[in-house]
């Protein structure tokens, strides 16, 4: 009984290292993109900001979700896994299926955060964050995918993608709270989420 626990803890330590690398690289890249990218034109209009968010989401969908669908389809077509009902699955196919499912979940969160962030960013300089964030998110999806093919721990290389979506949603939630009740509204809404997160964390210990 002791051996699996030891292996699990070793995997977790490796995963934490991968997460640290992911966060450092992602933050550095995001800051560089925001600094080097020229300001977007015409961002004083809400419709223009929503259009930018929609374009970014379309690109992200193509390079992540559609890529995952294609990977699974090609694997089905060219291997003994052709008939899903037969249950023949290679390790590569199982990883691709996990990537596809995870990306489907993550892209919903990302989209909500992206459009919400674009709603509140009212200048061309600030709106550089939208394509910069999209670029970093896409790269994190690929890092998750490639890392997962190496080991379960190495999928942590893409964890910054989830952090990006969460940060955007927290920013939007804070702004919504401020719109409703000023600073107290922000504190209440963000505080409620953090309390929920704490409960979920404690329940799994």
Specify the residue positions occupied by each region the protein language model found.
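Small-residue-rich segments of transmembrane alpha-helices in multi-pass membrane proteins
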Residues: 24-26, 91, 157-172
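Alpha-helical transmembrane segments
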Residues: 47-67, 114, 118-121, 129-133
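Hydrophobic core of alpha-helical transmembrane segments in multi-pass integral membrane proteins
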Residues: 19-36, 61-72, 170, 187-203
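Alpha-helical transmembrane segments and their immediate juxtamembrane interface regions
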Residues: 130-165
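Long, highly hydrophobic alpha-helical transmembrane signal-anchor segments
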Residues: 5-62
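Hydrophobic alpha-helical transmembrane segments in multi-pass integral membrane proteins
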Residues: 28-32, 166-182
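Membrane-helix interface/capping segments
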Residues: 66-90
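Core segments of transmembrane alpha-helices
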Residues: 101-116, 167
